[in-house]
């Protein structure tokens, strides 16, 4: 509901993710617009289903991929906990309870996500790409090091220092 209200320049400036059980049919029908009577604020979230085995998914899940409502993301929460961070799979991460709104980054309770993006069409050389990546890393690292308003957030953010740097514009 907040995302419906927070609009600037005709663009929604918020994001949220909803994680639901694979066998919760009401949740799986939350964006079935063809059924009618669904509040339009439900369009504001990215809905994903938590499931460890795709064989457990009911037919209702696949309906979004067949044009009935919206397709849902698929989250394997146990794998996220078991494997830990990318590149550090030898360290399990039992604190993971959720994800940022697009599920690029696993998060513990009270934790924030810290993401940056490199837009390749603006990069003219490999040297510049490396320079931009280093700057973004430093910016992320510094933003994660600042004092937070909520003590639980500060503790978990400073302990994990989770960040991500994405690359976009590859085909341009």
Question: Model-found features: residue ranges?
Answer:
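Function-dense linear segments that define catalytic or interfacial modules
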Residues: 64-172
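Conserved, charged catalytic cores of large soluble enzymes
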Residues: 4-94, 167-172
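Metallocofactor- and cofactor-centric catalytic cores in central/energy metabolism, strongly enriched
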Residues: 1
